[in-house]
Amino acid sequence: MNIESRASFAVRGLQVLLSLIAVFHLVAGAGLMFSITFQRFAVAGYGAELDWTARNIYFLRIVGSFAFVLGTIAAMAARNPLEYSIVPIGFIEFFLLRNIHRHLYSQELYEGFGVSSLTNDLTTVFFGVQAIALAGFLWAAHRK
């Protein structure tokens, strides 16, 4: 595979990955904003325990708004990821920071939300793979 076809493959990889990130964040964001049932599903899927107070429900709605905006940004960048390369860079940074926090403050995560160390490690791998894939595709796409 020559450099140009590798770059084209990498751009397509960025488009697919950003589209998947967009769909996830749009669906999760809308669900967290508008459905307590979805909130319960998401919290359980994350392996967390939460007191279902008005404060926590409202906080999850705010998290949903943030996720929805990230989904919109990812969807827009998926159309032309090289023109909007700041978006995959932002997601790389976001995923890395989440992984750092996940371990730097793991005791808070374990005690405050009842998340297991296995779930924490699996989540770290999930977001780490995405960060590496975005970085690899972005690097290869710029090597024309």
Predicted regions span which residues?
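Hydrophobic transmembrane helix segments
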Residues: I21-F59, G64
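Hydrophobic alpha-helical membrane segments
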Residues: P88-Y105, T124-Q130
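Non-cytosolic membrane-interface motifs at loop->transmembrane helix junctions
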Residues: G47, E111-T124
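Alpha-helical transmembrane segments of polytopic membrane proteins
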Residues: Y58-G64, T119-G128
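Membrane-helix interface segments
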Residues: L82-I86, G114
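Membrane-water interface at the C-terminal end of transmembrane alpha helices
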Residues: V125-K144
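Core segments of alpha-helical transmembrane spans in multipass integral membrane proteins
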Residues: V27, A54-M76, G90-E93, L97
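Cytosolic juxtamembrane helix and N-cap/initiation of the first transmembrane helix
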Residues: M1-H25
